[in-house]
Amino acid sequence: MAKYLIDKIDKIDYLHSSSSVRTFETSKYFINHIQFDKIKYDDLLYHSSATSMLNIIKNYTNEHQSVMIIAHNPGLTNLINQITNISLDNLPTTGLAEIDFDCDKWNNISRENSTLLDLIFPKQLK
């Protein structure tokens, strides 16, 4: 998945990852291929609910224009369903959802201004 992103993205402002061992290992693959201005490992993303994740996102500073979140299910899948117009059963491990928010501030994110741009599963790239 990291190699797939190289063709699409060369830099992301902020990598925000759960502090679990598994997500730390996953993040290393992305860090080896993509430039991040800031990286944070956060206990609050460990098994957090969609509502908790959305609250965390809404508290990002506006210096970040692009953010990558590495977290856990079912919270991550539920978050995607909550803020987009899709009904996803499960975002698989290392699955990617690219979402655009048409708003000026992170705390203004809502379903009404969110657009799912891309949804990629690892098995699609094999």
What are these regions (language model features)?
Residues 1-11, 33, 63-64, 77, ...:
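An N-terminal RHG(E/S)-centered segment typical of histidine phosphatases
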Residues 1-44, 48, 90-91, 126:
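Active-site-proximal alpha-helix that buttresses catalytic centers in soluble enzyme cores
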Residues 16, 65-71:
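Beta-strand elements within well-structured catalytic alpha/beta cores of enzymes
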Residues 26-30, 53, 79-80:
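Hydrophobic packing residues within well-ordered alpha-helices of enzyme cores
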Residues 45-57:
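Short alpha-helix plus adjacent loop in nuclease-associated cores
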Residues 60-63, 73-94:
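Non-DNA-binding regulatory cores of transcription-related proteins
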Residues 87-117:
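Domain-level recognition of soluble alpha/beta enzyme cores
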